[in-house]
């Protein structure tokens, strides 16, 4: 039985899909966590919820995030974008910074990334789910940043 549901919002305007569709086996196989993918159609990446930026990769392609509700997240922009060494990304936050839902985290150069990365498909993951927490996708297709993307249902633990 579900005792709590945590809603996670979209950090990106774009096309949302099930994580299994990610063109990378580690993400598609949920080896790094569970969530969804969004292929950006707009350049701004925002905080999905109130929380704290835990880390920004030196290459600016990924941000570790802890929501105020306790979810550890990874916002990974594009596939193999680590190889671009930060080109195509402008970062507006730093490690340890507190942010509110909708605050700008990154800006991306969609044209540059499209030309230089294998895919813009961006995994949005919960990286440290408990056994009693399950992700449920809430939206597929065209989505707008700030609207619900997926839910994390917290189930009552069996005695």
Regions found by a protein language model. Name each.
Residues 1-159:
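Contiguous, well-folded functional domains in the mature portion of proteins
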């Amino acid at each position: 039985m579900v005792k709590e549901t945590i809603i996670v919002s979209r950090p990106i305007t774009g096309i949302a899909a099930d994580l299994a569709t990610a063109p990378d086996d580690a993400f598609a196989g949920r080896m790094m966590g569970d969530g969804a993918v969004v292929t950006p159609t707009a350049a701004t990446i925002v905080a999905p919820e109130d929380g704290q930026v835990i880390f920004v990769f030196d290459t600016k392609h990924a941000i570790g995030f802890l929501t105020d509700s306790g979810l550890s997240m990874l916002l990974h922009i594009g596939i193999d974008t680590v190889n671009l060494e930060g080109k195509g990304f402008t970062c507006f936050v730093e490690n340890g910074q507190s942010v509110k839902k909708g605050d700008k985290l990154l800006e991306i150069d969609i044209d540059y990334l499209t030309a230089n990365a294998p895919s813009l498909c961006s995994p949005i993951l919960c990286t440290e789910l408990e056994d009693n927490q399950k992700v449920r996708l809430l939206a597929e297709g065209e989505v707008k940043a700030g609207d619900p993307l997926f839910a994390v249902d917290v189930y009552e633990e069996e005695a």
